Amino acid sequence: MNADKLINIAMNCHGNKDNTVLRLVDLITTMSQAGNYRVDKENAAILYVIASNEKLYNEYKTIMDLGNNEINIEKVDNNYYSSSEKALLRLGVNLFNGYTGRTAEESYDYCINNIMNKLDERNRLIAMNAIKIRYAD
């Protein structure tokens, strides 16, 4: 998946209703300026999740090192985030690198059923789009 395709998907899902597309372009630009030019399906899914939520976007530098393609797992489970934001972020992390937790309790938190049950309608749509992005042909 290239950056243009990801931006088109975001445009189709969000249009001009929010700033998702602008935030997504900023994340992709920041990533490429940091020397990481790879926008693959895994990157695309988590970038979309982060761009789709204003709070996650505002905190992305503490969550993800775009230049090194790394996630700070400790920040994902920060109590600063709402249960819905944590659920979206956990889904993004799982789609990015398959992470399912280090303990049985964490594994439950990363379970797709548990994630989807914590999301409202808007965030469920974001989650479904992220899954489509990750597993698209």
Where are these regions (language model features)?
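Extended, charge-biased low-complexity segments
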Residues: 1-81, 97-137
